Design a protein with these regions (language model features):
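Glycine-rich beta-strand-to-loop/alpha-helix junction loops that act as flexible
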Residues: 11-13, 68-76, 150, 206, ...
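Proline/glycine-rich low-complexity loops and linkers
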Residues: 51-57, 78-169
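Conserved short beta-strand edge segments in small beta-sheet-based binding/regulatory domains
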Residues: 239-251
């Protein structure tokens, strides 16, 4: 059985201009990792339909799942739903369940359900809805493409409705060995040897520097094989200790 994979497509001019800092990639990847679904690629595209269509079609052909964020709000530049419909070659219209739920929600708030708000009930033909417990306007699923809101709080809430629909893979275990005061260049040769001897384990090094008194290297190992991971962990701890550093462990 082929292990499932995922890609994330971030949509929005505000991301590319630097006005908005993305955190959706991080939270999607963190949600999927315990399910055994690694994020293999991330792209960011502007609010241009042709760019969105091209990216969606490229990613959905390559990966098990694609998660898009952004562009499903009530304004003129929220064009993601139209772009997804174009990518799949289908029409788009208001979903009756979305209209019903949103009308009830706005009615309960004594807020007018305006034409602009109704735009958020439009989904490609054949799509199923993704629940939005935060603001009510749904996301949707079109085959292997899940379309989420750009607001991080809403996107994260939508993942809870998506999770049960996903085909999961082998759970990846992870261990982090932190060495304060270590320098990445001093570790490079030995770290490469450890990684080469354990092909079933992904080994990486991530330096940090917060101040002259708070810096070092985090050595991170990941694997679906708990035994192989334990062996690499021991070697990473020994590597840190060989420089007179007491390793700090995070699992």
């Amino acid at each position: 059985m082929t292990a499932p994979t995922a890609a994330v497509l971030l949509i929005g001019d505000e991301l590319l201009s630097g006005r908005t800092r993305d955190i959706n990639l991080q939270q999607i990847a963190q949600y999927l990792e315990p399910l055994g679904i690694p994020v293999m690629e991330c792209r960011t595209v502007p609010d241009i339909q042709g760019e969105i269509v091209a990216a969606v079609n490229a990613l959905r052909a390559r990966y098990t799942y694609v998660f898009t964020t952004g562009g499903i709000g009530p304004t003129h530049d929220d064009i993601t739903a139209d772009a997804i419909a174009a990518a799949f070659g289908v029409g788009i219209s208001e979903h009756p369940d979305a209209i019903r739920d949103m009308a009830a929600r706005y009615g309960a708030m004594n807020t007018e359900f305006t034409p602009a708000r109704r735009r958020m009930a439009r989904v490609p033909h054949g799509a199923s809805l993704v629940a939005n417990p935060v603001s009510g306007a749904p996301g949707f699923r079109m085959e292997n493409v899940f379309t989420l809101a750009g607001v991080p709080q809403i996107a994260r809430a939508m993942l809870e409705d998506i999770g049960p629909r996903l085909k999961t893979g082998a759970v990846v275990c992870k261990v982090t060995v932190k060495g304060r005061g270590l320098r990445e260049g001093d570790l490079a040769v030995r770290l490469g040897e450890i990684a080469a001897a354990a092909p079933g384990v992904s080994v990486g090094s991530y330096p940090w520097y917060r101040s002259s008194d708070d810096h070092g290297v985090a050595l991170v190992a990941r694997s679906v094989d708990a035994g192989a991971l334990a062996a690499v962990r021991s070697q990473l701890e020994a590597l840190a200790a060989s420089f007179g550093v007491k390793p700090e462990i995070e699992v």
